Swiss-Prot record:
InterPro entries: EF-hand-dom_pair, EF_hand_DJBP, EF_hand_dom, EFCB6. Negatively regulates the androgen receptor by recruiting histone deacetylase complex, and protein DJ-1 antagonizes this inhibition by abrogation of this complex. Microtubule inner protein (MIP) part of the dynein-decorated doublet microtubules (DMTs) in cilia axoneme, which is required for motile cilia beating. This is EF-hand calcium-binding domain-containing protein 6. The modification Phosphoserine is found at residue 435. Residues 552-646 are annotated as: Interaction with AR. Pfam families: EF-hand_11 (PF08976), EF-hand_7 (PF13499). Residues 390-452 are annotated as: Disordered. Residues 432-446 have a biased composition (Polar residues). The keyword NAD does not apply. The gene is EFCAB6. Keywords: Calcium, Cell projection, Cilium, Cytoplasm, Cytoskeleton, Flagellum, Nucleus, Phosphoprotein, Repeat, Repressor, Transcription, Transcription regulation. One of its GO terms (biological process) is flagellated sperm motility. Its main location: nucleus. It is found in: Nucleus; Cytoplasm, Cytoskeleton, Flagellum axoneme.
Length: 646
């Protein structure tokens, strides 16, 4: 919770729920959000208590479990309406600061003894000593510190640790520096940067004001470098990083305290221009008024940014539809076989296949491309990025793009690494291997299941090539499959792709390996792969006046939005589901041990993977959105199958 009421109970407002959904990439239309909020705030108070919120989620409130941890108290992002709580916050921060200063003074006094003890204990002359031994030495020298206190002190001095060991020379140097800093004349001390680690809470805002006033130009330059479109806004995380660069040893706790004092701790974007122009006249008594005058909201999308996204979308579409032609053009330019082409050669390819670009448009596009140190385009990386299922978007779109996306497909290279590293698992209790050709070899349920993959475009291209050689391919797979498990290693599959000249990229191979790693053991299920390419399943033919229907809403307890992405996904997977819905239903039931007709999202995803259903993560999200409207994390598998059998 972000606020407390007069009785000290945590409360949540409409914006808090919206921020939470935004943070977890759960997209809701305004109408959907109003329905959700109405179901929580049944009395129309404009807020609900933390206990009421947990009760709506079916969770019993326990003060011991659901209160903020004491050690994370200052990181708890929120402001407090009770003065007593604010005083406690300031008192705790001041105490931790005083402890750090006292520990530093002790170390300075015992510097010679500590130095001799370290030299004596370092018999191998590596200059490194473990944390435990360091604590013991400090205790013997009269400077007893807990591991937490020692760690905080090391972090404040910038002394790093390696394998739980410290370079004691760095430690001694840091102690010496702190000693010399305290002994400097007053005139020189004023020229040194302010050490924020030693400040108490009341001084933080005033000292930051001094830094901002003395470094206006440098701060403006730093913020401008982040705000390339000159919108006046930067992310709060970027804003904090700039402040920490200028405010020597400003801690996270102090930064969050500073934001709360300025009443901008709940703002995802901060207007840095307003901050620099008006922070010198900030007074704590008028903080609310000062914060209200600051422009709100995320930076508006500039026409240039929109144009860049449009060009990237066109480029993605061109590469997807003319992959081989564009690849051939790149290879024709690459006469030295370096897997790179020049800037002008890339521009010529874009002009022929995408659109004729102005100098400004091409400069912005070139900045998004994978370029080597010599300024040449690495076209294999380019093809890998722009031929994937996801449309490529510039990284600058950031949080808003993530919120609109809802659920994105993880990077394929990361997905394949996680898939290949998963250990073998035993069969889930109550589940049995299915003998039907469409099923997987076993019904394993593993936490962290690899992402779903829509390999339909890849498999469609492969069908023509495999039709003439599938028997020989199957024979070689069986020869490599000595244990007769129905799968081979990923490297063996890649070797066969080369041998049979299947003409698919490494990226596409990795997608197939993820999809057909049906046992989550890093192996490639070749039987299911060959069957999918040889057994050509077509959708049921229907007249022009007919189309696939989703079951009526009154037959379902709760149904969600019927989006175009939802329909296109169901239409594509319909032939596969119709072909093997009976064994699939048996597998669903084996996971549904209680016989409720419902499966968890994780189990539902696992079964779809076992039957090699061509769905991307985004399409899977749309299906969940329809069949789990109440966000119960349970799917009615009978409702799902019924959609394909009417």
């Amino acid at each position: 919770f972000l606020e407390t009421d007069n009785e000290g109970n945590g409360i949540l407002r409409r914006r808090d729920i919206k921020n939470a959904l935004y943070g977890f990439d759960i997209p809701l239309t305004p109408r959907e959000f109003e329905k959700l909020w109405a179901s929580y705030d049944t009395e129309g108070k404009g807020h609900i208590t933390y206990q009421e919120f947990l009760q709506k989620l079916g969770v019993n409130y326990s003060p011991a479990v659901h209160r903020p941890c004491a050690e994370d108290y200052f990181n708890f992002m929120g402001h407090f309406t009770k003065p007593q709580q604010l005083q406690e916050e300031m008192k705790e921060l001041q105490q931790s600061t005083e402890k750090a200063v006292a520990a530093r003074d002790k170390l300075v006094d015992c510097y010679q003894d500590i130095s001799k003890a370290f030299t004596k204990i370092d018999k191998s002359k590596t200059n490194y000593i473990s944390i435990c031994k360091m604590q013991k030495v400090l205790e013997e020298c009269g400077c007893s510190l807990t591991e937490g206190e020692l760690t905080n002190l090391l972090n404040s001095w910038g002394v790093s640790r390696h394998d739980n060991s410290i370079n004691y020379l760095d430690f001694l140097r840091a102690v010496e520096n702190s000693k010399s800093t305290g002994a400097q004349p007053k005139e020189k001390e004023e020229s040194m940067p302010i050490n924020f680690a030693t400040l108490n809470p009341q001084e933080v805002v005033r000292k930051i004001q001094e830094v901002v006033e003395s470094s206006q130009l440098a701060l403006s330059t730093a913020f401008s470098a982040l705000d390339k479109e000159d919108t006046g806004f930067v992310k709060s995380t970027e804003f904090g990083q700039v402040l920490k660069d200028f405010c020597h040893k400003l801690t996270d706790n102090q930064y969050h305290y500073f934001l709360r004092k300025l009443r901008i701790h709940l703002t995802p974007y901060i207007n840095w221009k307003y901050f620099l122009q008006n922070f010198s006249c900030f007074l704590e008594e008028t903080a609310e008024e000062w914060a209200e005058k600051m422009p709100k909201g995320p930076p508006p999308t500039s026409p240039k940014a929109m144009a860049s996204r449009d060009i990237l979308a066109r480029l993605h579409k061109a590469v997807t539809s003319h992959y081989h032609a564009i690849t051939q053009e790149f290879e024709n330019f690459d006469t030295m076989k370096t897997n790179t082409i020049s800037r002008e050669e890339f521009r010529a390819v874009c002009n022929r296949n995408v659109q004729i670009l102005t100098d400004e448009q091409f400069d912005r596009l070139w900045n998004e491309m994978p370029v080597n140190a010599k300024g040449r385009l690495k076209y294999p990386d380019f093809l890998s990025r722009f031929s994937s299922e996801r449309a490529a978007t510039p990284t600058a779109t950031g949080d808003s793009a993530a919120a609109q996306r809802g659920s994105s497909v993880p990077d394929v290279s990361e997905g394949i690494r996680s898939a290949l590293s998963l250990p073998n698992q035993e069969l889930r209790p109550g589940s049995k291997p299915q003998s039907h050709p469409c099923t997987a070899a076993s019904t394993t349920a593993i936490p962290g299941t690899p992402p779903l993959q829509n390999c339909d475009p890849i498999e469609s291209r492969l069908r023509k090539r495999i039709q003439g050689c599938w028997r020989q391919l199957l024979k070689e797979c069986k020869e490599k499959d000595v244990a007769r498990q129905g799968d081979i290693s990923a490297s063996e599959f890649l070797a066969l792709v080369e041998k049979f000249n299947l003409d698919i990229s490494k990226e596409e191979c990795q997608q197939l390996i993820i999809k057909y790693d049906l046992k989550n053991n890093g192996k490639f299920a070749y039987c299911d792969f060959i069957q999918s390419c040889v057994l050509l399943l077509k959708a049921k033919e229907s007249s022009l006046m007919q189309r696939m229907k989703i079951q009526n809403a009154h037959k379902m307890k709760d149904s969600g939005a019927e989006t175009s992405s939802f329909y296109s996904a169901l239409l594509r997977i319909q032939p596969k589901i119709v072909h093997c819905w009976r064994p699939m239903r048996r597998t669903f039931k084996s996971y549904d041990e209680a016989g409720t007709g419902l499966l968890s999202v994780a189990d539902f995803r696992t079964v779809l993977r076992q039957y090699s259903i061509n769905l991307s993560e985004e399409e899977f999200f749309h299906i969940l959105e329809y069949y789990d409207k109440t966000l119960s994390s349970n799917i009615s598998y009978n409702d799902f199958l019924r959609a394909f059998l009417q």
